[in-house]
């Protein structure tokens, strides 16, 4: 904001509070998922960074089918969304240590806290088993989706998990140290 005050005509995107963020996912991500799966979406899992992806996508999917189960993923070490306290964590991309204005809690059915080591394990499994070089945040979302898939009520159901980051930015981190 200080820089914007100094630079006439500048623009601050404000990704944590700008309603264009969830609206973009309402207009694009949600319809793409719905169309690609011919409306056969039983659950949607996404990490919460700005809150825009999960909130906008959830709003669209729930308009199509109110029973779609929406899962928001947050760091277990900083479980603000589920009523805990902010804390340091290594899940870059989610868990901003405040509740973003763009996070619509009413659109979410469940919040799953994920431990750093579980996110790392899921990201490593994804690269080893599928050849998908995903990042830490993707690992967290995948781990949460796996937990959901193990529940009897989700057996045989279509669970969509959004993998928001690539692993190339983590090659020199503990994620790929093994």
Regions found by a protein language model. Give the residues of each.
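Hydrophobic/aromatic beta-strand patches that form the interior of the parallel beta-sheet core
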Residues: 11-13, 45, 71, 112, ...
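Short, well-ordered alpha-helices that flank and scaffold nucleotide-derived cofactor binding pockets
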Residues: 35, 59, 63, 143-151
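Short glycine/serine/threonine-rich phosphate/pyrophosphate-binding segments
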Residues: 47-58, 137-145, 170
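Phosphate-handling active-site elements
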Residues: 40, 63-72, 148-158
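Glycine-rich beta-alpha junction loops
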Residues: 17-20, 49-52, 74-79, 85-86, ...
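Active-site/ligand-binding loops adjacent to catalytic centers
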Residues: 4-9, 63-136, 174-178
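Active-site/ligand-binding-proximal alpha/beta "capping" segment
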Residues: 7-48, 105, 117-132
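Phosphate-binding loop/pocket of nucleotide- and phosphate-handling active sites
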Residues: 146-178
């Amino acid at each position: 904001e200080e820089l914007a005050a100094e630079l006439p005509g500048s623009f601050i995107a404000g990704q944590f509070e700008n309603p264009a963020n969830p609206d973009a996912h309402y207009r694009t991500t949600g319809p793409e998922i719905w169309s690609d799966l011919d409306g056969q979406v039983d659950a949607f899992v996404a990490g919460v960074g700005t809150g825009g992806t999960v909130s906008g996508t959830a709003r669209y999917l729930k308009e199509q089918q109110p029973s779609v189960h929406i899962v928001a993923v947050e760091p277990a070490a900083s479980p603000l969304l589920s009523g805990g306290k902010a804390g340091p964590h290594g899940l870059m991309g989610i868990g901003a240590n405040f509740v973003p204005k763009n996070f619509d809690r009413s659109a979410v059915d469940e919040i799953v806290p994920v431990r750093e080591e579980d996110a790392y394990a899921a990201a490593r499994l994804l690269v080893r088993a599928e050849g998908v070089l995903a990042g830490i945040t993707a690992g967290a979302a995948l781990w949460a989706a796996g937990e959901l898939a193990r529940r009897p009520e989700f057996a045989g159901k279509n669970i969509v998990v959004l993998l928001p980051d690539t692993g190339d930015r983590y090659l020199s981190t503990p994620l790929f140290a093994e």
